[in-house]
């Protein structure tokens, strides 16, 4: 098979949702259809002992939540599928946002009883900003939920995207009978031995069923007043195909997968800082690091840099340019993933995600190229933390483990590190409280380094240039610190303290990140 044909087989997407909408469960079912797991297990909390394949970190298994992005790959129906299962918890939106830079499409999972929730809306806005296609799976039809028409209306009003139902539920909860498949023009049956039936058989199968009569009325209304189906509008991110189903009972998931692969896009090009778009079919390899993960194998205290291949082909042992440093690197120890398990890979192509063993060479956002190509891809989003804690080792004899743990976990980008200019104290910044809990848990479990964490409350953060810096600017209402890149930064007590500082030093430029 030619390189072009291999690249065109790839389908790389992320699954996004609010916590508990069923995102990890649908991931399990997709892996089941891809033959990667023998049984799609229910995602449960710590008492059951049954863990999701994509939840590999110890704390994820204990709490039944996803706190880090997982990468999984399988072959299905002639396509090579790369799934990125992202954290649903809002505290880990930073990891999720960066992951969304590495995909060509998104699958949005919505709880049929709750509709569009806060985290779903936030993540959708990032996807919308990138104009990548969004496929919607409305989940949990095995439970009572809201009316389908009401859910479609909310999609359009809250998210501002047109929708087109690919199927329609027949009943819901205990009265759930199946799906009226508009795309494949058939019925998918929830009960009984037969999985499918013709639409012509519907009146006989559901005679005297009030739900089926309502379905026919809804579909007639949609055909008269709903949006037209347009493959181009889907690819442009202007129309979301909507699928109904139940991930828990594995109903409607395979139909979703088949139809998704029919319309999901091939790998797309990525913009450089100069505004050029790198074509995925270009033979020269290029890629970017969108994530760094420490201790995927706790026995080896390793670090993996996750790279999205943008163009060309990776071959084991190839030399690459690291544009940020201007230095070369050799890609010898490279893997692909099934959550925490991995296997060495000798080649991969545009659209694939590979893991490069990292000894501290790479940073999130790094561009890798070959030959004389020295461009950089557009930077990944960075976020200003909102809450802070001082951190120190509980046992001074564990200083070495403490520093190693902080260094590795900070390089993952899940938490940010600052050092007080005057005292040298370490301060951690996060988007949400759960990040601190995970940090503490991982420091103790993975590095055997207990930590003392002292809350500092919320702070308003602004960066300042070295040229403007004067240590006398520090006061009781702000803390002068350095970030992990040694850039000076002020942590202001509140917005009032920030305004007071800006009035006192009008010539000083204060920079805010995302």
UniProtKB/Swiss-Prot annotation:
It is found in: Cytoplasm. SUPFAM superfamilies: EF-G C-terminal domain-like, P-loop containing nucleoside triphosphate hydrolases, Translation proteins. One of its GO terms (cellular component) is cytosol. Belongs to the TRAFAC class translation factor GTPase superfamily. Classic translation factor GTPase family. PrfC subfamily. InterPro entries: EF-G-like_DII (IPR053905), EFG_III/V (IPR035647), G_TR_CS (IPR031157), P-loop_NTPase (IPR027417), PrfC (IPR004548), RF3_C (IPR032090), RF3_dom_3_sf (IPR038467), RF3_GTP-bd (IPR041732). CDD domains: RF3 (cd04169), RF3_III (cd16259). Gene3D superfamilies: P-loop containing nucleotide triphosphate hydrolases, Peptide chain release factor 3, domain III, Translation factors. GTP binds at residues 17-24, 85-89, 139-142. This is Peptide chain release factor 3. GO terms for biological process: regulation of translational termination. Increases the formation of ribosomal termination complexes and stimulates activities of RF-1 and RF-2. It binds guanine nucleotides and has strong preference for UGA stop codons. It may interact directly with the ribosome. The stimulation of RF-1 and RF-2 is significantly reduced by GTP and GDP, but not by GMP.
